[in-house]
């Protein structure tokens, strides 16, 4: 498959602001980085000639602690890059704010199921000759102000092109005689990487301005852009005055001439769209929303996925190894899970549940009951995700728990500057206290890859209730599905495609209202929360306790119906066919 699409062996260069490769390696903050890591792992499994570029964050994102009142506090992360990464000898340099900035890199090798190696390069400006300001560019992920962010995005895009050149990876139009590492496609994972197109224009022309339509078209034929943001305010923009300061007036004027600076602000998504031959959203619904935001652009759809082997619980992996020969290299084999006995799936799930509860007791000192129905909610603490919706009517929830025992597991970080997200965590802690001792509720600190795997695999239902249509895709429910954990979710993001009501999970009845004038008057929350309560009380909990075989069927359905499609083996194959192949342009 890969050979037929990439028979000329040209490389794909994948650029992402964050990439999650190891749980304890703080080069990611959330879903974007996790998707990037899963994409690269799948590409390695498929033997795709690919390399990747990101930034090294010496202070990571942040270490989270939550006090008894639910207030989030941020601490500094400390880690040693050499624990996971190997320094490369090659160096590069770029100009930022008129300063020459030296750039070094660290390498991480992903080994696919067939032994194929995919290198990931992390850029680092902690170099002796750099100024303190430039050294700090690779300290914090999503830290600082607009000035800091534009510096980082310049480093990722333009610096990434320079580093790849130093490492021997050159764009297809390069005149180098070495054909072994020619790049046939540059993939921008979100707009943070958009300035790589400026780096390519400079590489193509040898100058910082005066680009012709033909120059832009040459770069456009090499570039692919994936947008993950469903609202205009979520796309990175920077004042043109700041752009002049960081990139230089000549480059800033050229970007204005390219019509990617509406309202005197450099729009990174517009840069990426202008210079890409293929643009996609990350789910069918998200592509529809994106087409309205960018009516001048054709936005295709490639729905996200997860790397099945990475996110499957140990006991479930062993079960799949027993019954599904070849599933690790090709997630499509998960369709044969239809033949796995329900009792074996439930036994493997019980082991995953015990593994989660062991960690909960060690961290929070709370002993959870493995025989009690457990709701899971773990993701970035952002207002639109509504982590506190379950507590909309505490008396109603308590009444349900009086009939059917239940317990709840939460986790998730709020961005340090997101006051609304922080308030959400406070609301969850406050809501948990209001329930009293009848319902055990835990909030686990420092949500990371390993904790994510434990929670998505160890609960009995995965709750997801974002405001529609603000969830571009979401992938945590995909992880739970592969582990036989059904979702109770708003019909948004991937669940629009994945939900077969009462077969693989359940739909929360929730009107779309994100752009309505009565955005948050309480009625919408009441409708959505009542749908959650009603389905828990009338369908889900009675089935779990009184019809365990029927619940087991739902679990198995989620594996063999959702698993074969919502994975990165399928997703990367679609990128190969629709985006990376030069025949797709």
Outline where the language-model segments fall:
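Catalytic cores of carbohydrate-active enzymes across secretory and cytosolic contexts
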Residues: 1-585
């Amino acid at each position: 498959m890969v050979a037929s699409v990439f028979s000329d062996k040209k490389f794909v260069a994948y650029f992402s602001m964050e990439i999650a490769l190891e749980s304890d390696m703080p080069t990611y903050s959330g879903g974007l980085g996790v998707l990037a890591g899963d994409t690269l792992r799948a590409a390695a499994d498929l033997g795709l000639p690919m390399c990747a570029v990101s930034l090294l964050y010496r202070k990571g994102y942040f270490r989270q602690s939550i006090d008894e009142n639910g207030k989030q506090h941020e601490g500094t992360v400390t880690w040693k890059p050499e624990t996971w990464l190997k320094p490369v000898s090659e160096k590069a340099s770029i100009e930022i704010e008129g300063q020459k900035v030296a750039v070094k890199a660290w390498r991480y090798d992903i080994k696919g199921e067939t032994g194929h190696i995919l290198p990931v390069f992390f850029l680092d400006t902690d170099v002796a000759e750099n100024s303190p300001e430039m050294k700090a560019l690779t300290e914090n992920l999503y830290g600082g102000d607009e000035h800091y962010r534009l510096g980082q995005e310049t480093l990722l895009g333009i610096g990434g092109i320079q580093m790849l050149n130093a490492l021997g990876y050159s764009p297809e139009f390069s005149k180098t005689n070495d054909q072994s590492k020619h790049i046939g496609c540059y993939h921008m994972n979100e707009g943070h990487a958009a300035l790589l197109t400026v780096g390519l224009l400079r590489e193509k022309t040898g100058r910082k301005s005066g680009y012709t339509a033909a120059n832009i078209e040459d770069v456009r034929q090499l570039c692919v852009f994936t947008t993950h943001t469903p609202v205009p305010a979520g796309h990175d923009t920077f004042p043109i005055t700041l752009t002049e300061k960081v990139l230089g007036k000549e480059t800033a004027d050229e970007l204005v001439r390219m019509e990617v600076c509406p309202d005197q602000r450099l729009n990174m998504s517009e840069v990426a769209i202008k210079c890409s031959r293929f643009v996609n959203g990350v789910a069918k619904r998200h592509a529809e929303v994106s087409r309205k935001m960018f009516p001048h652009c054709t936005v295709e759809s490639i729905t996200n996925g997860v790397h099945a082997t990475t996110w499957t619980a140990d006991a479930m992996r062993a079960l799949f190894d027993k019954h599904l020969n070849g599933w690790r290299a090709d997630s499509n084999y998960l369709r044969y899970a239809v033949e796995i006995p329900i009792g074996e799936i439930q036994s493997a799930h019980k082991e995953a549940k015990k593994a989660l509860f062991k960690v909960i007791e060690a961290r929070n000192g709370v002993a959870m009951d493995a025989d009690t129905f457990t709701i899971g909610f773990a993701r970035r603490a952002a207002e639109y995700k509504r982590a506190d919706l379950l507590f909309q009517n505490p008396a109603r929830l308590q009444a349900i728990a009086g009939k059917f025992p239940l317990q709840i597991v939460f986790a998730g970080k709020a961005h340090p500057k997101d006051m609304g997200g922080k308030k959400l965590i406070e609301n969850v802690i406050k809501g948990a206290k209001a329930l009293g001792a009848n319902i055990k509720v835990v909030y686990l600190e420092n949500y990371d890859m390993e904790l994510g795997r434990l929670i998505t695999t160890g609960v009995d239902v995965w709750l997801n209730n974002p405001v529609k249509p603000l969830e571009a895709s979401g992938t945590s429910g995909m992880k739970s599905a592969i582990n036989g954990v059904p979702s109770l979710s708003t019909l948004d993001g991937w669940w629009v495609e994945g939900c077969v009501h009462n077969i693989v999970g359940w739909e929360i009845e929730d009107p779309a209202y994100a752009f309505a004038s009565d955005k948050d008057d309480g009625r919408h929350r009441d409708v959505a929360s009542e749908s959650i309560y009603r389905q828990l009380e009338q369908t889900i909990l009675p089935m779990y306790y009184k019809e365990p075989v029927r619940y087991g069927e739902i679990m198995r359905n989620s594996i063999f119906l959702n698993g074969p499609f919502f994975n990165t083996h399928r997703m990367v194959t679609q990128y190969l066919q629709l985006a990376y192949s030069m025949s797709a342009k």
